[in-house]
C-alpha cells in the first residue's frame, strides 16, 4: 500500500542520511 512505500522511502532516506 501507499504507507508501505512511504516507510520504504523513509528507510532509504534514513540510511542515506547517516
From Swiss-Prot:
<dbReference type="GO" id="GO:0006952">
    <property type="term" value="P:defense response"/>
</dbReference>
<dbReference type="InterPro" id="IPR013157">
    <property type="entry name" value="Aurein_antimicrobial_peptide"/>
</dbReference>
<dbReference type="GO" id="GO:0005576">
    <property type="term" value="C:extracellular region"/>
</dbReference>
<keyword id="KW-0964">Secreted</keyword>
<dbReference type="Pfam" id="PF08256">
    <property type="entry name" value="Antimicrobial20"/>
</dbReference>
<protein>
    <recommendedName>
        <fullName>Citropin-1.2.5</fullName>
    </recommendedName>
</protein>
<keyword id="KW-0878">Amphibian defense peptide</keyword>
Amino acid at each position: 500500500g501507499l504507507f508501505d512505500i512511504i516507510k520504504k522511502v523513509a528507510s532509504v532516506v534514513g540510511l542515506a542520511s547517516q
